[in-house]
Amino acid sequence: MPTVVVMDVSLSMTRPVPVEGTEEFQRKHLAVHGLTMLFEHMATNYKLEFTAMVVFSSLWELMVPFTRDYNTLQEALSNIDDYDKTCLESALQGVSSVVQQEWGASIPSQIVLVTDGCLGIGKGSLQHSLATLNQRNDSNRFPLPFSFPSKLYIMCMANLEELQGSDSLEYLERLIDLNNGEGQIFTIDGPLCLKNVQSMFGKLIDVAYTPFHAVLKCGNLSSDVQVFPRPEPVITDEEIDPLPKTINTDLEVVGFIDIADISSPPVLSRHLVLPIALNKEGDEVGTGLADDMEDENSANQIAGKIPNFCVLLHGSLKVEGMVALVQLGPDWHGMLYSQADSKKKSNLMMSLFEPGLEPLPWLGKTMQLGPITDAKENPYGEEDNKSPFPLQPKNKRSYAQNVTVWIKPSGLQTDVQKILRNARKLPEKTQTFYKELNRLRKAALAFGFLDLLKGVSDMLERECTLLPDTAHPDAAFQLSHAAAQLKLASTGGSEHGAYDHNIVPLQTDFSGRNSDRI
């Protein structure tokens, strides 16, 4: 999940902050101190995060493009200049441009906006931007909500009392609301000083940049791992009173399945699984991603001497061409698999399925899967030439049938004309006539288009009166019968208006075999 740090470099950030016993600080210095702390934490505990830095006043500038080199980011902090007035809309437009150019519109991102709470003056101020929100067209729309999934964290170099006194807090809260409620505002508790700034950025780290550590288990084997990026809580829409579901810190492998059987399933998110090496005393050595070559070699030497289940599992899945089903929580599963990063390098990945008993319909209920040895005969065949999957659904899925689409008038007109063409060819086209008639009837009932049924009924009655003298007598009977059935369905009552009811041909006999002879 990439991060964009957005630093306010307007003149208001140069306002002095009295600090007892030391030289005078500016709010800009407090912001630099907090960001330095954040970058140091990420360099140690969140090394895989791609981070960019944007500065803004009335305009915006990309100081550092997306990188994992936190030394470059810290150097950029020391080269920041002071500019003119604040324009938050310009900054947010810059963020949108930077993220979409690098990552597109589907990758979730985190935005850390560091400002002093001053909203600017005149045109370009946040007050003006929000006041004209409903007067814009698509060409100059406000950048929030972003076109990509995002969380907006606003770090204010001011305390709560100062923001409330200037009404700035209300406008900043509007930004979070415009971002679909995704994000949070952080303020300094107490007086403005380095210690309180550290405390504020510490809260941000706890919320967004704490690494997710877990224990990967399979039977008696286990391994400490880091899951990156950290999995987000999931809220299911189907529940009446939904609660966010979080994955367990104990990830238990419950079985293995062929890659061909799992296919390419829909997933909520994908994560890298990294082994955490521990020394003999149980202290954490790390994931092997060290800052310099000397530390990296030392960490790799230590990690290489210790057997690790995570490494064993990764290699086995890669060689055998299988995935591991892993229990994430109650009625919630995911899969572990090897994904090639290049010709020589691959990574152990974890994908999260939708919570539920049957996340992948072609596998059936996950809890009912079992080992091959439980089956009476090998479901894959003696020569491994067949598969028990996919399971055939009990009911036909909607996509297995021809769906009736009436988005345009021409689609409805075509379906009605098809019925009329078959009506003129009765009784030869009796089966086709009733098939098309029932298809139109079901679609009309599904859409609540009861007037259509009455209209088609009137058309069939008219066709009946226009039949030529040479027409087969059965045609008139079938048309009258179909028209009457549609008229009953158009009332919406009785069994004739039921969706599952089908109109069947009227049974007639013109052979004379059943007539009485004198």
UniProtKB/Swiss-Prot annotation:
One Pfam family hit: IntS14_b-barrel
All copies of domain VWFA, residue ranges: 2-204
GO CC, alphabetical: INTAC complex; integrator complex
Chief subcellular location: nucleus
BP-aspect Gene Ontology terms: RNA polymerase II transcription initiation surveillance
Protein origin, superkingdom: Eukaryota
Positions with a binding annotation for Mg(2+): 10, 12, 86
InterPro entries: INTS14 (IPR039841), IntS14_b-barrel (IPR045814), IntS14_C (IPR046471), VWF_A (IPR002035), vWFA_dom_sf (IPR036465)
Subcellular location: Nucleus
Keywords, sorted A to Z: Magnesium, Metal-binding, Nucleus
Family: Belongs to the Integrator subunit 14 family.
Subunit structure, interactors included: Component of the Integrator complex, composed of core subunits INTS1, INTS2, INTS3, INTS4, INTS5, INTS6, INTS7, INTS8, INTS9/RC74, INTS10, INTS11/CPSF3L, INTS12, INTS13, INTS14 and INTS15. The core complex associates with protein phosphatase 2A subunits PPP2CA and PPP2R1A, to form the Integrator-PP2A (INTAC) complex. INTS14 is part of the tail subcomplex, composed of INTS10, INTS13, INTS14 and INTS15.
Protein role: Component of the integrator complex, a multiprotein complex that terminates RNA polymerase II (Pol II) transcription in the promoter-proximal region of genes.
Name of this protein: Integrator complex subunit 14
Organism placement in taxonomy: Eukaryota, Metazoa, Chordata, Craniata, Vertebrata
Gene this protein is translated from: ints14
